[in-house]
Structure formats: C-alpha cells, structure tokens
C-alpha cells in the first residue's frame, strides 16, 4: 500500500497491480490510477510471476474488481512471446464484461490483430512483434487512422509539448505521417502544392515530434 501510494504521489498516471490485488488494497487507492493485471494461462488466472495457478477465471476477476479500478492489463500467458497470434475470443469475452479500459497482451503479432482489438475498444501491448520487426510501430499507428474520411487527408492539430498552446492546423496523408514518425520532424501535406512539406526545412524552425 505504501509503495503504491508513493508511486502515485510521485506522478505516475497509472500503476499496475497484479498478485497483490485485493479488495482491501484497491479500496484504499484512487481507482482512476489503478490497472489490475490479469494473467491468464489456459483460462485460469496465474499469479506470483505466472507460477501459481489460482483456479479462478479471468471473468471472475473482472466481476470482483470492476468497481475498484480504472481498467485491466489482460495477458494471455500461453501465447506470450510465441508470435503465433493472440486469443482474440478470450479477450473479447473480457471486453463484454466491462466498460473499463482494457489493454491486451500476449502473442499479438500482426496489424490485423491490432486493428481487430482497436475495433473493440481494446488497446494492444506489443513486445516480440516489435523486437523481431514483424510489426513496425509507424505502420501500426497509421493503420489506426482513417484517411478515407476526407480524401486521404486527416486534420492535424499541432500543439506545443510544454505550453500546450495550439500552434497550427495542417493536413496529413499517410506518407506525411509515416515520414514524421520515422524522421521525428513534423511533415504535412500541402493541398495547394499537392506535395509533402517538412516544417522548417527552409526557415530552420523545425517542429520536433515528442
């Protein structure tokens, strides 16, 4: 309890609590700061570094803790690191039980899976697919954007990272977003010139992506 309170007091937006999760502990913490880790191996929750089988289902965990947390990190343990795809149906079962934030992990290995999870309002935690370059982050990010709504362009609001002041409104196509993510410098699409342009190339006033 003291460690959790200290981490939150030091500015953590969220903390993840796994084996230690209990009604007593969670009731003493601000629930908007808490994600409960549910580690599932073949349909049963495992704790203590995945070494202890509890015999409890993930569904029971959600019913038990749903009023005490902000959301869940749900890991399919038997799929973790295998690069064979995750268990989408098991994850969707959890989605049906809660409206809270849900992050899925374990075996996610393709952009199609990421898109399917996103469609169901489920975030993806990626590991091995990034390390092995099976999925590139910039490709995954772009896949979540709907470029077709406005003739392959999306409005891009540019904001100062420190002051939060809105600096400009520009438009980006997929190539502009990809270049921005790869180079770290803001690149947009000029509708008047019908071409990409990187802010600051001539003036030197670059916009760095943070």
Regions from the PLM with identified roles:
Residues 23-36, 114-143:
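C-terminal helical cap(s) of enzyme catalytic domains, especially alpha/beta-barrels
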Residues 57, 83-86, 109:
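Short secondary-structure boundary/capping elements
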Residues 142-210:
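Binding-site signature for planar aromatic cofactors or substrates
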Residues 15-19, 75, 80-83, 103-107, ...:
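Glycine- and other small-residue-rich loops at beta-strand/loop junctions that grip anionic moieties
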Residues 30, 66, 96, 118, ...:
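Anion (oxyanion) recognition and catalysis
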């Amino acid at each position: 309890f003291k460690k959790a309170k200290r981490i939150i007091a030091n500015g953590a937006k969220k903390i993840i609590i796994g084996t230690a999760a209990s009604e007593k502990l969670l009731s003493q913490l601000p629930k908007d700061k808490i994600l409960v880790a549910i580690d599932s191996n073949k349909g049963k929750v495992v704790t203590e570094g995945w070494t202890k089988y509890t015999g409890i289902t993930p569904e029971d965990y959600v019913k038990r803790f749903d009023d005490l947390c902000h959301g869940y990190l749900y890991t399919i343990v038997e799929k973790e690191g295998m690069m064979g795809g995750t268990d989408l149906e098991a994850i969707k079962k959890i989605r049906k039980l809660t409206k809270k934030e849900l992050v899925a992990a374990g075996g996610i290995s393709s952009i199609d899976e990421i898109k399917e999870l996103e469609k169901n309002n489920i975030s993806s935690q990626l590991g091995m697919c990034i390390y092995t370059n099976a999925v590139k982050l910039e490709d995954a990010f772009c896949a979540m954007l709907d470029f077709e709504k406005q003739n392959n362009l999306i409005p891009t609001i540019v904001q100062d990272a420190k002051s939060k002041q809105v600096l400009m409104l520009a438009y980006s196509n997929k190539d502009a977003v990809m270049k921005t993510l790869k180079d770290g410098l803001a690149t947009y699409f000029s509708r008047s010139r019908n071409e990409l342009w990187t802010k600051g190339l001539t003036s030197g006033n670059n916009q760095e992506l943070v």
